[in-house]
Amino acid sequence: MNTITIKTVINKKDFKKFIDFPYTLFKDDKKWVPSLVMDEKTTFDKKKNPALEFCDFKIFLAYKGPEVVGRVVGMINHKSNEIWKEKRIRFGWLDFINEDIVCQKLLEAVENWGRSEGMTEIVGPMGFTDMDKEGMLVEGFEEDCTMATYYNPSYYPQIVERLSYKKEVDWIQYRIKANQEIPEKIFRINNLIKEKYNLRIVEGLSA
């Protein structure tokens, strides 16, 4: 078994590895829906993401030999910590192969950086602000996902909990009951929108 090495992303070459890793990890997973690469890059661009005016972050990659096997971002939102009187470091963009040690080393890297910055608490997965995606999928792995929802394999929460992390709250990403009767109000709104914008439904045939 190769030793797991954690490295901090400090250049464009490593940042590309960070962006590309999920495409390798989930290449055979039909449930995974990738984020737009442009959006991911913008999120970490201090010139384009206003949140980075009050957030510090570090990106870590886990290696097994020359191969990237995991990634994570540690974030300190100074504005949030000041408002809520907390000393929290956040973690997000946590992706890793199905090995406890990889996740452990990644989270330890975030924890250690947090301690060095005076933080006393860690929480995640989160983004830079509370307007970003938050949480980890714990049920519904068989359901289709979208770009707007979180997706992760079922081993993620299992491994994180084995590392003594505790769930704080349960959220429902989305729930649609297809057998419910559609209210008349929805039909009226639908017709108004179609008339106002001159819309029509076109059914295409597959090739």
Report the location of each language-model feature.
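Acyl-donor binding region in acyl/amide transferases
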Residues: 82-164
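Glycine-rich, histidine-containing beta strand-loop boundary motifs that form or position
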Residues: 72-76, 93, 123-128, 169-171
